C-alpha cells in the first residue's frame, strides 16, 4: 500500500511530540490524533495531538512567561493539545505563522473577557516558531501547546438541530464575532496584515499567514498585494503562463500602474479595519449537545487584520453569511440586510438555507456585528475581488484540480477565463 504524504511522516511527528513533552519535563500516558484521517490525500494545515499526561503539568512546566501564554492552573493540567504547524500546507506563509496564531488568540481572549463572554478560546501554554520551511524536517515545525476543550464538532450536528436551537447557537456565534471585530489592536499592530511579537514580547504588525510580504498601511495596498500574489502564482503556471498570450499581462500591469485598484476603491474607507478570524465556520467550533452552548472557538491559523468585509468573503459559508458562495437571493439579502420576504418557489432545502441565513442576520443585528450592509463600498470591493479570482482561478491554478482534466479541457477553461479577464479590463478602460 502506498502511503500518502501525511502517513509518511507520522512516526517522525510523534517523535517530535515526545521531544516537546521532554523539554517541558512532561511524560505522556497516551498520545492520540485529533481531526486526522489516513485517507486524506493532501498535506494537513496542522497536525493535532491529544496528550494525556502521566502527571499533571504545573506552573514549573508552563509558567506563562512566554508572550501570549497562560500559566498552568494551580491544580495542574492532565490533558493538553499539541499542534504542529505544517510548513508544507498549501498557500501558507510560515514567516511568523505561529506567532500570529498565538497573538491573535491572546487578543481575542482579552476581548471576550472584556465583553463578559464565556472564555471559548483555549488557553495557550507554550509555543515555538517554525525555524525552517523544509517540509521533511518535522523537528523544525512550529508548534503550540494549548488547553483541551470538550464538546462535539458543531458542523456535524448543526443541520439536524431544531430551528430554535440553531437560533440560540447563532446568537452565541454572533457574540463571538462581535468580540473578534472589537479586539483592541495594540499600538504597534495597526497595519493590514498579520501580527507577531517584537523582541520585548509586544504584539506588533507582521506578515499574514495567507499572504507573503510585509504589512501595509491601507486596504488599497492590501488588495494590490493580493493581486500581485496571484500574478506571481500564474507566472509559474504551465497552463496560464502569466497571461502573456494576447498581451493580457501587459494590460493588467497598466491597470495596476495607473492606480486602477485605488480608483475602484475610492468610495471605500481604506483605513477601516479589524481582526479577521479567516475561517469562522461551524467546523471550527465545539458545543455541548445537552445545553446547546458553544464550548470552544478554534483554528486562528488564518487570522489577520483587514476590512471587516473580508470575514464575509472567507467565512460563514455554513450559516448563510458568505457573500461569495451563497445563492443570488441570499447574497442580495445579506448585502441589503433585508430578509423580510423570502424568494418565491423555494424548494425545502432552499427554505431551510434562507431561514438559517435570516436567523444569522438577526443575530448579527442583535449583537452589534458589523455586517456587509454596514460597510461602505461593498460592490467596489467585490468587483476587485472578481479580478483577483480571474487572475488565478482554482481550477486552473491548483495542481490537483488540473490533473482531473485533459489538455483540451484545460485549454478551453483557460480561453474562457481569458475572455472574462479581458472583458473585466475593458470595462475599466484597460
Task: Please state what every model-predicted region is.
Residues 37-233, 237-242, 268, 272:
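ATP-binding pocket architecture of kinase catalytic cores
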Residues 89, 132, 153, 285, ...:
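Conserved protein kinase catalytic core
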Residues 1-39:
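Juxta-kinase regulatory segment immediately upstream of eukaryotic protein kinase catalytic domains
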Residues 7, 11, 38-42, 91-99, ...:
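Alpha-solenoid helical-repeat scaffolds
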Residues 127, 148, 169-184, 276-288, ...:
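Conserved beta-strand->loop/alpha-helix structural units within folded catalytic cores of enzymes
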Residues 167, 229-233, 302-307, 311-318, ...:
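Helix-rich C-terminal or lid/interface subdomains of diverse kinases
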Residues 44-52, 180, 256-310:
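Active-site acidic catalytic loop and adjacent metal/ATP-binding pocket
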Amino acid at each position: 500500500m502506498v502511503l500518502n504524504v501525511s502517513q509518511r511522516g507520522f512516526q517522525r511527528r510523534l517523535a517530535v511530540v515526545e521531544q516537546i513533552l521532554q523539554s517541558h519535563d512532561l511524560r505522556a500516558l497516551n498520545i492520540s490524533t485529533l481531526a486526522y484521517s489516513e485517507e486524506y490525500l493532501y498535506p494537513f494545515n496542522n497536525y493535532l495531538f491529544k496528550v494525556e499526561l502521566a502527571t499533571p503539568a504545573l506552573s514549573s512546566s508552563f509558567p506563562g512567561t512566554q508572550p501570549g501564554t497562560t500559566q498552568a492552573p494551580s491544580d495542574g493540567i492532565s490533558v493538553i493539545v499539541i499542534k504542529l504547524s505544517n510548513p508544507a500546507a498549501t498557500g501558507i506563509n510560515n514567516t511568523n505563522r505561529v506567532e500570529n496564531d498565538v497573538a491573535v488568540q491572546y487578543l481575542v481572549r482579552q476581548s471576550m473577557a472584556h465583553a463578559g463572554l464565556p472564555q471559548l478560546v483555549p488557553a495557550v501554554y507554550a509555543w515555538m516558531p517554525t525555524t525552517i520551511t523544509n517540509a521533511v524536517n518535522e523537528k523544525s515545525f512550529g508548534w503550540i501547546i494549548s488547553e483541551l476543550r470538550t464538546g462535539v464538532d458543531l458542523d456535524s450536528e448543526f443541520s439536524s438541530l431544531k430551528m430554535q436551537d440553531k437560533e440560540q447557537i447563532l446568537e452565541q456565534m454572533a457574540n463571538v464575532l462581535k468580540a473578534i471585530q472589537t479586539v483592541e489592536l495594540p499600538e504597534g499592530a495597526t497595519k493590514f496584515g498579520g501580527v507577531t511579537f517584537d523582541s520585548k514580547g509586544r504584539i506588533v504588525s507582521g506578515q499574514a499567514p495567507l499572504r507573503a510580504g510585509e504589512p501595509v498601511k491601507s486596504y488599497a495596498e492590501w488588495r494590490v498585494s493580493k493581486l500581485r500574489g496571484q500574478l506571481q502564482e500564474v507566472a509559474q503556471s504551465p497552463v496560464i503562463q502569466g497571461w502573456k498570450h494576447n498581451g493580457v499581462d501587459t494590460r493588467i500591469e497598466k491597470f495596476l500602474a495607473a492606480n486602477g485598484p485605488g480608483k475602484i476603491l475610492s468610495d471605500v474607507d481604506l483605513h477601516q479595519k479589524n481582526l479577521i478570524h479567516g475561517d469562522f465556520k461551524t467546523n471550527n467550533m465545539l458545543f455541548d449537545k445537552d445545553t446547546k452552548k458553544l464550548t470552544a472557538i478554534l483554528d486562528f491559523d488564518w487570522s489577520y487584520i483587514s476590512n471587516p468585509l473580508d470575514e464575509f468573503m472567507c467565512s460563514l459559508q455554513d450559516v448563510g453569511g458568505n457573500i461569495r458562495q451563497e445563492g443570488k437571493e441570499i447574497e442580495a439579502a445579506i448585502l441589503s440586510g433585508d430578509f423580510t420576504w423570502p424568494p418565491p418557489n423555494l424548494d425545502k432545502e432552499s427554505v431551510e438555507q434562507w431561514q438559517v441565513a435570516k436567523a444569522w442576520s438577526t443575530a448579527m443585528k442583535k449583537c452589534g456585528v458589523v455586517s456587509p450592509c454596514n460597510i461602505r463600498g461593498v460592490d467596489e470591493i467585490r468587483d476587485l475581488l472578481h479580478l483577483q479570482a480571474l487572475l488565478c482561478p482554482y481550477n486552473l491554478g491548483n495542481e490537483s484540480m488540473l490533473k482531473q482534466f485533459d489538455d483540451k479541457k484545460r485549454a478551453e477553461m483557460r480561453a474562457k477565463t481569458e475572455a472574462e479577464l479581458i472583458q473585466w479590463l475593458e470595462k475599466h478602460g484597460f
